[in-house]
Regions:
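Catalytic Walker B motif of ABC-type/P-loop ATPase nucleotide-binding domains
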Residues: 60-63
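Conserved ABC ATPase signature
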Residues: 35-39, 43
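Conserved ABC ATPase "signature" region
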Residues: 10-31
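Conserved catalytic motifs of ABC-family nucleotide-binding domains
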Residues: 56
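Helix N-cap at the start of a conserved alpha-helix in ABC-type nucleotide-binding domains
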Residues: 71-73
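H-loop/switch region of ABC-family ATPase nucleotide-binding domains
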Residues: 96-97
Length: 150
């Protein structure tokens, strides 16, 4: 299918079947006939993931997927990203500024400061000193779970 076909709504039956299948897998089938403006921020993020999955990617780039989402919606989106990665064997690069989410959902963290990598390793190896280096702030000024860490 070309981009022009998509603009004019000329989708094949196979495209429609795949879209419905992915919508069901992501828990969005009930919103099939809703306009985008009627969806919550978390639902919109999930729709974005569905749209990406329709392209059958080998890599999924997620730039701040939970920014501006409430905690419950953020959890749903992060769980979906992890599920998509595991079930479809798709590598996911997720850019997050929420330390708590990175620690909870990611197996590997690449922390950068000033355009340079200051940490690249497993989540379990990330120390408070490394977090301070990544954010260039003492732990007492950083928040996790709505509370200062230190």
């Amino acid at each position: 299918m070309s981009a022009l076909d998509g603009v004019f709504g000329r989708y094949t039956e196979e495209d429609k079947r795949r879209a419905l299948s992915i919508l069901e897998q992501t828990g969005l089938r009930d919103f099939l006939y809703h306009r985008a403006g009627e969806l919550s921020g978390g639902q919109r993020q999930r729709v974005g993931i569905v749209r990406a999955l329709m392209q059958e990617p080998s890599l999924l780039l997620c730039d701040e997927p939970i920014a501006s989402l409430d905690p419950a919606s953020a959890q749903v989106v992060m769980e979906l990203i992890c599920e998509v990665s595991a079930k479809r064997n798709i590598a996911c690069i997720v850019n997050l500024h929420q330390i708590e989410a990175a620690l909870k959902y990611m197996g590997r963290i690449i922390g950068m400061y000033g355009g340079r990598i200051v940490y690249d390793g497993p989540t379990s190896g990330l120390t408070e000193a490394m977090i301070e280096k990544i954010y260039n702030k003492p732990m007492s000024q950083l928040m996790i779970g709505g509370e200062a860490i230190a």
